[in-house]
Amino acid sequence: MKNLRKLLHLYLKSIHPRVYFQVAPETAQFPYLVYDFTQITSDGEEFETVAVDVDGWDMPANGNTTALETLMQTVNDALNKKTLTTEGLAVTFYLDRKIPLLDDNKKIRRRKYIYEARLFGRS
């Protein structure tokens, strides 16, 4: 998973400068992205299916979600059906679901896009 994490992190950073794995620091500037691998299923050989969550976070002064929606659309345009490769693996991402999330802090706006990533190991 280390190689997949590194590959995805670099790719998301090419889309948006503030990208974090699992948890953003409390000092993170909005808007930002947080990604995680929530489930990994292996066939026992060189194929794995990975559920990848990409969460967009924003705290707009006026509550308007346009910037967040634009960010998430940009992420999806770049990631959906995209194949990334590095030494030892190739992975293709497919959008599965889009979920608007409510945060305990009513000023924060969130969107979660869940991707099914199909990962192939290479010998």
What residues fall within each predicted segment?
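Charged, amphipathic alpha-helical segments and their flanking helix caps
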Residues: 1-20, 36-123
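A short beta-turn/loop motif at secondary-structure boundaries
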Residues: 24-28, 105
